[in-house]
Amino acid sequence: MRTSQYLFSTLKETPNDAQVVSHQLMLRAGMIRPMASGLYNWLPTGIRVLKKVEKIIREEMNKGGAIEVLMPVVQPAELWEESGRWEQYGPELLRFEDRGNRNFVLGPTHEEVITDLIRREVSSYKQLPLNLYQIQTKFRDEVRPRFGVMRSREFIMKDAYSFHTTQESLQETYDVMYQVYSNIFNRLGLDFRAVQADTGSIGGSASHEFQVLASSGEDDVVFSTESDFAANIELAEAVAIGERQAPTAEMTLVDTPNAKTINELVEQFNLPIEKTVKTLIVKGADENQPLVALIIRGDHELNEIKAQKHPLVADPLEFADEAEIKAKIGARVGSLGAVNLNIPAIIDRTVALMSDFSCGANIDGKHYFNVNWERDVAMPEVFDLRNVVEGDRSPDGKGTLQIKRGIEVGHIFQLGKKYSEAMKATVQGEDGKPLVMTMGCYGIGVTRVVASAIEQHHDDRGIIWPSDEIAPFTVAIVPMNMHKSESVQKYAEELYRTLQSQGVDVIFDDRKERPGVMFADMELIGVPHMVVIGEKNLDNGEIEYKNRRSGEKEMISKDKLLSVLNEKLGNL
C-alpha cells in the first residue's frame, strides 16, 4: 500500500474528550472516528487491525471444531418473550417496531436466535454435539458509553454456542473452548488471566472471564502469586486464617455523637480500624424477615454478589433505607451493631475471628467497645461476605493474592438448559423420547480486543502492537527525500515490489513529507519493522532498520536486507 493512495488520517494532537490511552491513540492513529455517542466509523488502518484479529479468531475457532454461521442483528421480540428476557433485560436492549407494528430488538447477544435456529434444524441426538459461531455486530444501549470502543454502544463480537445431549459433553467442549481462547489471546500477544466469574444476566452455571491486565480496566482481577488460581473479585473466596483470641477487657458503652462513620470512629477514638466492624442492613428474601444485617470488618468491603447468594438475603441485593432501619432497629446508620440486634445477622468469616472489637450499640450516638463473641453476644451465622484484599491467602492454599485491574475481552459460560427449556429446544434421545439440549456459550469482544492490546502496549510515540500478526502493516518503507533523489526512489520502488511479491504487508510512504513526519506517523500506527532509505547510506551500500517493539536500530548491507528481514519477520 502506498500512502499517496491511502486514507492516512493521523492527528498530531490528542482529542480532549478521549480519556484512556487506547481511545486517544486510536483517534490519533486514524483508526476510528466518532459518529454519535458510542458509535464509531472504522477507518482503513483500524479495519486492517480488526480483520487481522478476526482472522486469528477464525483460525483458532476452526481448529477447535467450531463452525461459522451468520445471524441477523435485528431479532423478533417474540423470541425474547419466549426466553423470558424481554421483561428481564433493562433499557440497554434497544426495542423498536417495524412498519407492520411488529416488535423487534437490535441484538445485544444471540442466545435466543441460535436456540431457535437449532431447534428447527436439529432433530436427533445423533447430530450433536454442535458448536456454531459468528462474528457479528451487536448493539447495547449503554447509559454512559465511554473509553472509545472499549465501552461503545455498537461493537463487534465473536459469539459461539454449543449444543449437547449431556453435561459431560458440554464440559468437553467447554474445556476445548477454554484452550481455544487461551490460544487466541496468546497469539495476540496479550498478558491475560482466565478467571472464575459470575454468570450475570446470561445465566447458567460455570463461567470464566478472560481478562487483559491493564490499569484502565474496569474489573478487579485476583490471582495467586504461586499457582494458577485466578478469579474475578466478585467470585474470589476470602479465606480467614488464625484463631479468635481470648477477651482482654470488659465491654463498655461509649458516647460517640460525632462518629457516624467507621473512619470518624477510628480517628476520634484512636482505634485500629481492623478492630472495628460495620453493620449493613439489606432487604431479606423472606417477607417474615424483611431486614437482614451483614457485618464485616471496618476496613473491608461488602461483596454484593456473594452476599445475595445467602438464602436470607434478597437477590438482587437491595440496601434498606434510613426510615426502614430506624423503624425496625431504633437507631440510625452509623450506630448499628451486633449487640442487642433485633433482626437476623450474618457475619463475615474474618469478623468471626475478631475479639475486643468495636461496633454500634443500636442506640443513636453510642458504640460498644471491647465486644467479644459468646461472652457479650451470641455468634451469628458465618458466611463469606467480603471482597478479598491483596495479601490474603489464596483459596487453593498456594501463595497469597494479588489484585490488578483487568479488561474483560472474553467470557465462556456453561448455560445448561436455561434457554433450551424455556424455548422447548429438544431432540429425539437415544430412548426415542424428547431430550432438552444442554448449551454453552462463548464470547469475545473483537473491537474491545483491539483497544485492550493498545492499552497494554504503547509508549509516548504511539502504538506498539504486541504481535506482528495484528499490526496494520508489517513493514514500513520510509524513503528520505525520495522526490529529490532518483537512487532512493528507484531502490524504494524495487524493495516495495519485492516485498509485495513475497506476501509481506508493506506500506510505502511516498508522500512529499519531511522525514520526521513520516517517522512519527509510522511509529504512531505501530508498524513493527521500519526500513529507512537515505541517499548517503544508500551510496555506502547500507539501509537503516528500526524495530518498533524493541527500539533497536541497525545498519544493514542492502545486499543482505531481504535475508535479515526474512529472519526478523519469520514469514518471508
From Swiss-Prot:
GO BP: any one term: prolyl-tRNA aminoacylation
PROSITE patterns attached to this UniProt entry: AA_TRNA_LIGASE_II (PS50862)
GO MF term (any one): aminoacyl-tRNA deacylase activity
EC numbers on record: 6.1.1.15
Keywords: Aminoacyl-tRNA synthetase, ATP-binding, Cytoplasm, Ligase, Nucleotide-binding, Protein biosynthesis
Pfam families: HGTP_anticodon, tRNA-synt_2b, tRNA_edit
Gene Ontology CC entries for this record: cytosol
Coiled coil ranges: none
InterPro entries: aa-tRNA-synt_IIb, aa-tRNA-synth_II, aa-tRNA-synth_II/BPL/LPL, Anticodon-bd, Anticodon-bd_dom_sf, Pro-tRNA-ligase_IIa, Pro-tRNA-synth_IIa_bac-type, Pro-tRNA-Synthase_IIa_type1
Catalytic activity: tRNA(Pro) + L-proline + ATP = L-prolyl-tRNA(Pro) + AMP + diphosphate
Major site of localization recorded for this protein: cytoplasm
Localization terms from the record: Cytoplasm
Summary of the function given for this chain in its UniProt record: Catalyzes the attachment of proline to tRNA(Pro) in a two-step reaction: proline is first activated by ATP to form Pro-AMP and then transferred to the acceptor end of tRNA(Pro). As ProRS can inadvertently accommodate and process non-cognate amino acids such as alanine and cysteine, to avoid such errors it has two additional distinct editing activities against alanine. One activity is designated as 'pretransfer' editing and involves the tRNA(Pro)-independent hydrolysis of activated Ala-AMP.
Subunit-level organization: Homodimer.
Entry's family note: Belongs to the class-II aminoacyl-tRNA synthetase family. ProS type 1 subfamily.
UniProt domain comment: Consists of three domains: the N-terminal catalytic domain, the editing domain and the C-terminal anticodon-binding domain.
Record-linked HAMAP family: Pro_tRNA_synth_type1 (MF_01569)
Designated name of the protein: Proline--tRNA ligase
Organism: Haemophilus influenzae (strain PittEE)
Gene name for this UniProt entry: proS
